[in-house]
């Protein structure tokens, strides 16, 4: 155990967060996301909610300030989003500083970004469209 680091952050996730450089992207996905077929390394965080992990990592993780650092998947035409999901994520991310805007992109554009991500953290999140991409910034 390390002081001030949440026990929700596994050693594997801590290593990945430290190895990421500015501009690298990481996805925190819901339990339904096809993470293992995307290509990047997959970290399992079964049983944890995305919002809890976001709250745990945000004290350690600088979001990009030059490009939109937060991306979520848009609903497929004819489907609906639960606004509570984004609200939970915004609340978790705003504990250290104001939360930047979250942009939405279509499912296939999100999959393309996922294939290029540094890592994908697959969680126990069951919320539909519960995936979020974070772009790492330069640590001050």
Curated annotation (Swiss-Prot):
Lineage of source species: Bacteria, Pseudomonadati, Pseudomonadota, Gammaproteobacteria, Enterobacterales
Single Gene Ontology MF annotation: identical protein binding
Annotated catalysed reactions: alpha-L-fucose = beta-L-fucose; beta-D-ribopyranose = beta-D-ribofuranose
Principal location: cytoplasm
Disulphide bridges: none
Substitution effect: residue 64 to A: Affects slightly binding affinity toward L-fucose. Significantly reduced ribose pyranase activity
EC number: 5.1.3.29, 5.4.99.62
A single GO BP: L-fucose metabolic process
Family: Belongs to the RbsD / FucU family. FucU mutarotase subfamily.
Domain of life: Bacteria
Localization of this protein: Cytoplasm
Assembly with partners or alone: Homodecamer.
Catalytic residues of the enzyme: 22, 64, 111
Recorded metabolic or biological pathway in which this protein acts: Carbohydrate metabolism; L-fucose metabolism
Keyword annotations of the record: Carbohydrate metabolism, Cytoplasm, Fucose metabolism, Isomerase
Protein name as catalogued: L-fucose mutarotase
Residues engaged in binding substrate: 30, 73, 111, 129-131
Described purpose of this protein according to its UniProt entry: Involved in the anomeric conversion of L-fucose. Catalyzes also the interconversion of beta-pyran and beta-furan forms of D-ribose.
Gene from which this protein is expressed: fucU
UniProt-listed InterPro entries: L-fucose_mutarotase (IPR023751), RbsD-like_sf (IPR023750), RbsD/FucU_mutarotase (IPR050443), RbsD_FucU (IPR007721)
Species of provenance: Escherichia coli (strain K12)
A cellular component annotation (GO) from this entry: cytoplasm
């Amino acid at each position: 155990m390390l002081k001030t680091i949440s026990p929700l952050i596994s050693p594997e996730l801590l290593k990945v967060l430290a190895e990421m450089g500015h501009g690298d992207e990481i996805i925190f996905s819901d339990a339904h996301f096809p993470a293992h077929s995307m290509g990047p390394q997959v970290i399992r965080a079964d049983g944890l909610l995305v919002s809890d992990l976001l709250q745990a990592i945000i004290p350690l993780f600088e979001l990009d300030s030059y490009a939109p650092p937060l991306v979520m998947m848009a609903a497929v035409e004819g489907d609906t989003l639960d606004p509570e999901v984004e609200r939970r994520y915004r609340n978790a991310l705003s504990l250290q500083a104001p939360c930047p805007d979250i942009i939405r992109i279509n499912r296939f554009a999100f999959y393309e970004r996922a294939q290029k991500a540094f890592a994908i953290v697959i969680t126990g999140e069951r919320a539909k469209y519960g995936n979020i991409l974070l772009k790492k910034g330069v640590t001050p």
